[in-house]
Structure formats: structure tokens, C-alpha cells
């Protein structure tokens, strides 16, 4: 089946780009690569320069910026934390409550070969005794 037959399908040629456009694209990539190298060198030396004067002032002030006015709404909401959580307490949580055990109908059934089908009271006592001895619990 099929062999070495190859078909030459003519594709549209995109080599009509002028030399000036090629040189411009090469120059752009060179500029981008040189900028990336400069950034990496600065990071390697451990120097990070921030051109923002506001950031520099904030760093000098120890992160305390005195230019921001106090917002009374913000302060009043923080003064009473019960207002922050009031809407959350009224909502009903639809998930499982871990204080209550799940109903047996929800639990998966064990495989039939794990447990015998019929339980005699003596079998149950023997099983509990064996489990307690395996777990080293005093009877």
C-alpha cells in the first residue's frame, strides 16, 4: 500500500519580504534580547531598581505612607468585627456535619467475601475476641 509517491503541491511563497523589513525585525529581536540580558544581570547582582518615586518614599518610610487620608468607613467596619461575619452566620451550610455519623444507607457495602452471610452470636463473640487480641486491648 502506498509507496514512495510524493506530490509537489505548490504553496504560496512568503519570501517576498524586503530586506529592510528583515533587518528591522532582526534589530527588534536583538534589542529585546539585550534588554532581557540587562534585567537578568541586575537581578543576579541583587539590585532591584524601582523607578517609581512613590515606591521609593514608601520604602524609606518603612511602609508607612502618610499621604493617605483616614477613611472613616473602613475604620468603623474594623471596630466591630461582628458586622463583618454577620452575613455569613445566617447562611445555611449544605455540607456534611462531622459531629453526626452518616446514615447506614449512605455507607458503601463491604464485599461479600469479607464477612460471612449469616451471623451467629457465638461467631460475633469470637470475632470481637480476635479483634481485641489483635489490637492488644484488654478484655
From Swiss-Prot:
The annotated regions of Low complexity compositional bias extend over 60-75
Q: Kindly give the InterPro entries that the UniProt entry links to this protein.
A: PNRC-like_rgn, PNRC1/2
Is-annotated flag, keyword Phosphoprotein? no
* Compositional bias per record (Pro residues), positions renumbered to this chain: 101-111
Write out the ranges of the annotated region (Disordered): 1-111
Composition-biased stretches, type Polar residues, lie in: 11-36, 48-59, 76-93
One GO BP annotation here? nuclear-transcribed mRNA catabolic process, nonsense-mediated decay
GO CC annotation: what is one? Golgi apparatus
Q: Which domain of life is it from?
A: Eukaryota
Q: Where is this motif: SH3-binding?
A: 99-105
Name its cellular compartments.
Answer: Nucleus; Cytoplasm, P-body
Q: What is known of its domains?
A: The interaction between PNRC2 and nuclear receptors is dependent on the SH3 binding motif.
Q: PANTHER family, from UniProt?
A: PROLINE-RICH NUCLEAR RECEPTOR COACTIVATOR
The record describes the protein's role as: Involved in nonsense-mediated mRNA decay (NMD) by acting as a bridge between the mRNA decapping complex and the NMD machinery. May act by targeting the NMD machinery to the P-body and recruiting the decapping machinery to aberrant mRNAs. Required for UPF1/RENT1 localization to the P-body. Plays a role in glucocorticoid receptor-mediated mRNA degradation by interacting with the glucocorticoid receptor NR3C1 in a ligand-dependent manner when it is bound to the 5' UTR of target mRNAs and recruiting the RNA helicase UPF1 and the mRNA-decapping enzyme DCP1A, leading to RNA decay.
Oligomeric state and interaction partners are given as: Interacts with UPF1/RENT1; preferentially interacts with hyperphosphorylated form. Interacts with DCP1A. Interacts with many nuclear receptors including ESR1, ESRRA, ESRRG, NR3C1/GR, NR5A1, PGR, TR, RAR and RXR.
What is this protein identified as? Proline-rich nuclear receptor coactivator 2
The protein's gene is named: PNRC2
